[in-house]
Amino acid sequence: MSDTVIILQDECILAAEGKEGRIPKVSQVFRIPVDSYGDSVEQWKKALSKYNEEHHPDRVKLVLPVNYSTARMTQIPYVSGKQLSNMAHNVMLENGIEGMADYSVVSADKKQGVCLCCGSATEELLKKLADMFEEISLPVHTISVPMEGYLRLLSQLKAYK
């Protein structure tokens, strides 16, 4: 089973197919043109519908555009489980993140604490995207913000050394 990362942008959509793992392997990369005028979600829908028909991706990880999402990096004391969820939620509220939000753990160390990447997008945008995925049968398993991708890349680069 291959993974596909799709990066939404106003001017185009980037798609990379490959295998996830300790050392990810990219097998194909595509730049999908998008009309630069009109409703962005409708333009993405047209482009992704065609891509989906041609490539039939198994698992899609979607990265939201920078201008449609927000991301915050924060450090909290070392906790796990329910405490981690509660602290991350409080941090997102304190930072004024609006809409729907989630977080991922970038690093965790008992002495240094937990480094979180908190991302959010408006509920309206996420609803439009969810409706679009369902309509074109695109198997999206994960939605992320660009900052999380950068951080994962940096952690992969450290793992190579």
Feature-to-residue mapping (PLM):
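Amphipathic alpha-helical regulatory segments at dimerization interfaces
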Residues: A47-Y51, V91, M132
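N-terminal phosphate-binding loop and adjacent alpha-helix
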Residues: V26-N52
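Buried hydrophobic packing residues in well-ordered domains
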Residues: A15, L62, V91-M92, F133
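Internal amphipathic helical hairpin motif
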Residues: L64-G119, L151, L157-K158
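Short glycine-rich phosphate-binding loop at a beta-alpha junction
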Residues: L48, E53-Y68, H141-S144
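Small-residue (GG/TT-enriched) beta-loop-alpha framework at ligand/catalytic clefts
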Residues: S2-K25, R31, E54, K110-K161
